[in-house]
Amino acid sequence: MVIKFVFSHWSNILAAATALATLGLQTLSVQAESKIYDPPSITSDKEISDTLTENDIPTGEGGFARDYNVQLEKGDQVAIDLTSDNFDSMVMLIAADGSTVAENDDGPDGTTNSLLFSRITEAGKYIVRVRAFGETSGGKFTLKVTRLEPNSK
């Protein structure tokens, strides 16, 4: 009799299980969507020392990246200097819409350090992305964002 009851109500049991599973998935997706990506901020003319690790953002190329927010104004001319004795550094400046404004792999001094110059055309929050070139996992680095003074001549 129990078997007959289970089979006769099987569609109701299946519908209830599906509804519960769907509600559970919706709850999980709402929790995941509520997390906002907000990297730490860096101010111009202040040098920071940090460490790129395997706990940072995977690049998909075997390396890792770390982001910093920086507020820039229209007309700013910035230099972004990234140095490391532990890895071949790359630096990127990324606009609020996710587009790459500028990037640099190796600086003009012939080392694997990075030096990027850019003129800002739109005020807003930008991301400075520090990453290791290739499959290097990372290490210690120094990062500095400098607002350059316009030439008065």
Task: Please provide the spans of the model-predicted regions.
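Short solvent-exposed loop/turn micro-motifs enriched in small/polar/acidic residues
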Residues: 62-63, 84-86, 111
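Noncatalytic accessory or regulatory domains flanking protease catalytic cores in secreted, cell-surface
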Residues: 3-4, 89-144, 148
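Hydrophobic beta-strand segments within beta-rich accessory/binding domains
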Residues: 69-84, 91, 126-130
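Non-catalytic extracellular/lumenal accessory regions of secreted precursors
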Residues: 2-4, 24, 28-69, 74-76, ...
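Bacterial N-terminal signal peptides that target proteins for export
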Residues: 2-15
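Bacterial N-terminal signal peptides
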Residues: 14-25
